[in-house]
């Protein structure tokens, strides 16, 4: 989407704002939830010494929540706006790499990764269907894909924003509502239907949070775990 705004810079500011106060606790909780299923598979030996791909690494905020029993960890993002923080992670752990990648056209070979983790990216994409096809292409048979889906504009998410996050976003160049309207262009229902089609021959598990009710409008986010058959 073409706009007159510097959305990359506003995203950086927004993330800095989210990692302050109570919202930081909520964000870290969602990271743990996104990593949980894959970590459990590692703990029981179903995924061992894996090569991991993270889509939407940002400034590396998900990494501390990932089980550290892996062979290689590829952090990727559409730009290098968070590279300063990620470089520190790479220096401390030589198994970690950062690469600028477009999930709609990944440079990796097919059947390359054991585990793929996509942070809050799918709602932002211009070509989400193509991105899902790319994820399926580069994951190995038996590999796990974990996808974070924002439920914007759900009632629950809007309430959380009103109570906690909106007041933090006054330093953005545009209203926070407009930022989300531009960035979260793909609805949760459309994303789920695309996932069901692209991964129709695979094992799909859809979990709603913070409640277990299967209604996106009563959720703040959805996590989809897929095992390629």
Question: Which role fits each region the language model picked out?
Answer:
Residues 115-126:
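A short SAM/SAH-binding and catalytic strip from SAM-dependent methyltransferases
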Residues 64-67, 132-136:
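A structural alpha-helix within SAM-dependent methyltransferase catalytic domains
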